Amino acid sequence: MKRIRNRKDKIKMWIAIVVVVMISGVFISTLIANKKVPKLGVVDGKLTDTPQTPNAVSSQTTDEDKKVAPFPYKENLQSTKDGIKLAVKAYGDVKIIEEKADYLRYVFTTGLMRYNDDVEFYFDDQNKVVHFRSASRMGYSDMGLNRERYNALYDYYMKN
């Protein structure tokens, strides 16, 4: 009887080890994917296309499910850029990655899981609009977070 129990205990131990290894593997692969920095920016007046997955929004996409309106200019480029920066700062959990005369790039970090989302603003001075792109670095669905972020930033920008 004791030998059977020891055998059952060994099986349980091996199952526990396998589960811990699998969970660790998922955690490590998620961590690596979250840290991988995508190639972004503006090429010929266009932000990078949105991915095939539904976890992104852009003012320059042709996909109606991911489309958002560009931000209108304020008085000039500088006041517009200041307004965008103010809205981003108010939103929080953000780090600026790149700033150029006509471009801002940020990384927003989600609350619970600490996922990184890339957010870009392209200041189209000729058309007096600011194009926007927000995309999750990993996963399939963002449960609407990128659109919510856009709405919050847009509303704050328009009110201030």
What are these regions (language model features)?
Residues 3-16, 25-160:
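Ser/Thr-rich, low-complexity intrinsically disordered terminal regions
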